[in-house]
Amino acid sequence: MLRITGGTVYDPANKIDGQIKDLNIDAEGKFCDAPVDGRTIDATGMIVMPGGVDVHTHVAGGAINFARAMTPEDHRRTQAFIRTKTRRSGIGGMAPTTFATGYLYAGMGWTTVNEAAVPVLSARHTHEELADIPIVDKSTLTLMANNEIMLDQMEAGEYERARDVVAWYIWAAKSYGVKAVNPGGVAAWKWGGDARQLSSPIEGYDKITPGTIVTQLARICDDLGLPHPMHLHCNDLGAPGNITTTLDTLKHLEGSRAHIAHSQYHAYGGDDWDTICSATAQLAEYFNTHPNITTDAGAVIFGDTVTITADGPWQHLLYKLTGRKWGNLDVENETGCGIVPYTYRPSNLVNAVQWACGLELLLLIQNPWQVFLSTDHPNGGCF
């Protein structure tokens, strides 16, 4: 039981805007009107608000472990968490270990994190690792947009069977919803290709296109009544001029719910690295007129980090652009994974545009319930 007294409370969901009031929490963790026995915290002069939710992060599973193994130099230079009577040991840095992840998130006021990319093949281990992260609540999303079994059903025109495949995978992986990464592009990467636009059949198939996958997978999530809509990492991430692909993707989502992940990486104009520019105004305008679509910003932080994504072809391109270390994983017939360390520099035109795009989206989208603050940890920087 807990009582918090004298704090300035902000709670938008309950329309509390800066009121000084006492809060009473009973033994079940619920608010109650009557004062309770137990611990009292004097929050005079402090702000009391609901815990933050990081809707898109990468904190557990094979990919983040691969990233940790690839960056031993970061372990040597980073903050160490020494074991005490109340705390387990760990390290921070670009990809903090499990215990450190929980402590660092809680220290910033976050109480829920969503591991946004889990292959079914490694879901069991991911849950074991999530159980090791203290304090915060956790959820996961299952990678589906390049799953060969589902794609085969879509190719055959068997929508109901494709829906049942997705339902079984979500049940088997014990996840909160569906993650779609570069739909069709990761499947094409297994053949050395990619899918940077939505209208051409993907490698290995005659009929289905990335647009088909986007439309049908969003519909499947709606038909299954999932609490979170399809969580979409669009095609052509990170490329100059990719705003065209992003807006085309959104047209394929008309009438469906969807969440666009790390939208900063999908909001670029220009036609080359020398002419890359922000196109966030176009994207924000779409969000402002389509309340069925939510997004997280994917803002970047200047400094060293390590990028991890199921978008294998993009990571191979990033490796060629930077000359840094590169790791690539093929997850059987489900998905893929790429790892590349990266440094965001304010003196770099592309990085400066990326930094500005993340802030612009947070400011230009009018409904604050429609946009989430995220760094796509660790891709845009450690949370």
Annotated model-derived regions:
Residues M1-M49:
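N-terminal metal-binding scaffold of metallo-dependent hydrolase/deaminase domains
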Residues R3, G51-V53, M230, L373:
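Residue-level marker for buried hydrophobic side chains located in beta-strands
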Residues A43-E129:
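Metal-associated gating/positioning segment near the N- to mid-region
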Residues E158-N182, V186-F372:
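Histidine/acidic residue-rich metal-binding segments in metalloenzymes
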Residues F372-F383:
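Terminal or standalone catalytic/regulatory effector modules within metabolic enzymes
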